[in-house]
Every structure is written in C-alpha cells, then in structure tokens.
Amino acid sequence: MAKLTARDLKLSFGNVEVLKGVNLEIKERTITALMGPSGSGKSTLLRVFNRLIELYPEARVSGEVLLDGQDVFKMDVIELRRRVQMIFQIPNPIPNLSIFENVALGLKLNRIVKSKKELEARVRQALEKAQLWDEVKNRLDAPAGKLSGGQQQRLCVARALAFDPEVLLADEPTANLDPENTAKLESLFLELKKDMTIVLVTHFPAQAARVSDYVAFLYKGQIVEVGPTKEVFTNPRHELTEKYVTGKLY
C-alpha cells in the first residue's frame, strides 16, 4: 500500500524547473532511498512531501501529493508536519536547551501532553527509540550542544519521534557523520521502519544499497528509474542508472 504518492509533480523557482512531472509511490513501512547527483531535485522533492517548500515564496508547485490518499495541500499544515517529520543534513538541535527540553519543547508548544509525568514518559520513549537514552539518561539537563555530532543527529530523530509520526523524511542525515555514527543511524533506520515509513535522500549509492527496500534514481528533476533496491542495483533498466550505481556518473 502506498503511504505517499506523487502524481505529475512539478516545481519551479521562477523560470528554473526543478521537478519535472515526478510520479512516485512510497510504500508503507519501507525505506525508500532517493538517489542521484547534486541538483537532481531529491531534497526539493522531500520538502514538498511535508510542505516545507512553502517556506520559499518563489516556489511554484503543481500536481498532487497524497498521504494515505489525502491531498497534503488541503490538509492542516501543522497536522501534516506532525505526521510527516523531517531531519536534515546538519543536526539542528537547539544547542543551549537541555537534551530533555529539545525533545519536550514541541510536545509542550503543541499541547500534546497533559501532565509532567506524561511528558517525561514521551521524552524517554523517544530517546529510547532513537537509541540514545542509555547515553544521555544521566545528563538530561546538559545542553544539547555538548553532544557529539552523531548524538545530536539521533537527538533530532528523537525530537521527531516524540510526535509519533507515520513518515520520517531524512535529507542526507549521515553526510556529516563519521563511519561509526553513520552505521548507528543506518541501524536505527532499519529498526524504525518496522513502525513507520522512511524516505531517505542520499548521495551515496552504497548507503542506498545497505538500508533501502526501494530506490528512486533522479536526474535533472525527473525520475529515471524506480524499483526494488536489489533489482535496480543488479539489473538497472536505464543506462543513466547503471552509470550512477557504478560510479561513472556524479
């Protein structure tokens, strides 16, 4: 079953076309990797899924994006972003806030919890799901900026998970991490997909091969090929895909 669907999705900034008639189905409780060279439209597509693209007034969008069959452009945007959370290439916790408050803040601002006890339980649950609890449970009052880069990224995952989202969008989340923390985050994604849908933007074909169930290869704003990961990597149908997965196209 498709969790997210894009139909004839087009996007431009002024006279520059960034997405050119994208059609894509993201299956529920899978990891779908969006891969392709820089400038192919991967991160832009991700930002359309939860309407972050609306932060750019010059962006013009046409076509459809559906979440469980519902038009996201007709949904309440706050509700949409609660259900479709996002993490970014550069970890972005609020550095001077405590580890606890970084996870708790969104819950409090959106009045999702009704008591201190419930808040504490939700924060702990999110940190446990992000595989960070054991590392920070004795210093929850410490500033988030004191965490390592890998820990900060997992804190951002915990912050997203606190909302109990259905979809997690991840925009090159390991680009600034060392191999050890990259492996931790990839392992985390494999665990999280049991309960949610993950869309991962990556510049690294090897990462897509390691963690994704499906891949979509984008080139110059168009989807060239989409399919099960193993099939796309071992038997690509398009010459451009073959060049990309073998390192001949950057």
Curated annotation (Swiss-Prot):
One MF annotation (Gene Ontology) recorded for this entry: ATP hydrolysis activity
Binding site for ATP: G36, P37, S38, G39, S40, G41, K42, S43
Catalytic activity: phosphate(out) + ATP + H2O = ADP + 2 phosphate(in) + H(+)
Enzyme Commission number(s) from the entry: 7.3.2.1
Matches recorded under SMART domains: AAA
Membrane topology: Peripheral membrane protein
Gene3D superfamilies on file: P-loop containing nucleotide triphosphate hydrolases (3.40.50.300)
Enzyme superclass (EC): translocase
GO CC term (a single one): plasma membrane
GO BP: any one term: phosphate ion transmembrane transport
Family from the record: Belongs to the ABC transporter superfamily. Phosphate importer (TC 3.A.1.7) family.
Physiological role: Part of the ABC transporter complex PstSACB involved in phosphate import. Responsible for energy coupling to the transport system.
Oligomer status and interactors: The complex is composed of two ATP-binding proteins (PstB), two transmembrane proteins (PstC and PstA) and a solute-binding protein (PstS).
Protein name per the record: Phosphate import ATP-binding protein PstB
